[in-house]
């Protein structure tokens, strides 16, 4: 089995703008098949910044944000299902579109808005210029085997870069910072010092 180099080409807005991988296998009928996400990508420590949000996507998110904060806000929470004997399922592996959709739809709580937004995000995905970056996020997330939801995982991975955020898009910065201001009190800290 012969592997060629995993190549990265950078640009001004992100360290990784394009990802190309060439795998060469011997021409046997039983040649091994290897997907990109099965490779050991632990050497990729610097994920690219979240791509600049396109004007179409900004408008879409603004519309759904307005719907979610308006009249429909009474139906925000779905009824809770009984989880008495809940079996832990193996997490579904993400692809680039699932990562993209998960990141941009996470702040919409209304179920009907979520469903419609998901369909509209599928259309936006077809026009997305940075599909490879979202695919890279998904590959790294799958490889990490994290128990965190994708959006939270991405936020944690990119939190080191928040201080030196270079994107010219304040919407993206705001998306990352939405949950970064939550303070959790450690109630066990005092108890452990007493014993």
UniProtKB/Swiss-Prot annotation:
UniProt similarity note: Belongs to the MATALPHA1 family.
Main localisation: nucleus
Superkingdom in the source lineage: Eukaryota
GO molecular function, one term: DNA binding, bending
Localization of this protein: Nucleus
An annotated GO BP: positive regulation of mating-type specific transcription, DNA-templated
Functional summary from the UniProt entry: Mating type proteins are sequence specific DNA-binding proteins that act as master switches in yeast differentiation by controlling gene expression in a cell type-specific fashion.
A cellular component annotation (GO) from this entry: nucleus
Other facts: In P.angusta, all mating-type proteins (MATA1, MATALPHA1 and MATALPHA2) are encoded on one idiomorph, consistent with the fact that P.angusta is a homothallic haploid in which any strain can mate with any other strain.
Keyword Nucleotide-binding: no
Residue ranges the UniProt entry marks as DNA-binding: 89-145
Keywords per UniProt: DNA-binding, Nucleus, Transcription, Transcription regulation
Name this protein carries in UniProt: Mating-type protein ALPHA1
Keyword Manganese: no
Organism, as annotated: Pichia angusta (Yeast)
